[in-house]
Amino acid sequence: MKRPIVVINPNSNQSVTDGLGECLARFNNNKSHPIECVTLKNGPFGIESQLDSDSVILPLANFVKTRPDAGAFVIACYSDPGIDTCRSVTSQPVFGIQESGVLTALCRAERFGVIAIADASVERHRRYMARMQVINRLA
């Protein structure tokens, strides 16, 4: 049975989803776990604030509940919005790109760094890293 890895763009910007699909295409040769990129159509155009991040939590969880066929989910937004809520509504693995990126970096070095795309995002990312208990390893 094919169990896709569902990569969810939680904003409504289809060009972001298309870009994700293009970047992931070279990894999409696994016949048992194809990669499927989807757009959360009722999300904001971009996740630029805490309000934007919070506004997609329930729509993300509701979407995850509609996909019992998925082998895993990836929340493709660096804020990892709704990761805990999504994990609470499925038995499938749910990965966030911030959590996955930071933890992978820490497997390779004692400290890590992050380049944010907007100043307004920095504090939100720092709060999440503190919650992950890795803020003291931020370079």
Language-model segments: residues:
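N-terminal glycine-rich anion-binding loop in soluble enzyme alpha/beta folds
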Residues: 1-59, 117-139
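Glycine/small-residue-rich loop that forms an oxyanion/phosphate-binding "nest" at active or ligand-binding sites
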Residues: 57-110, 114
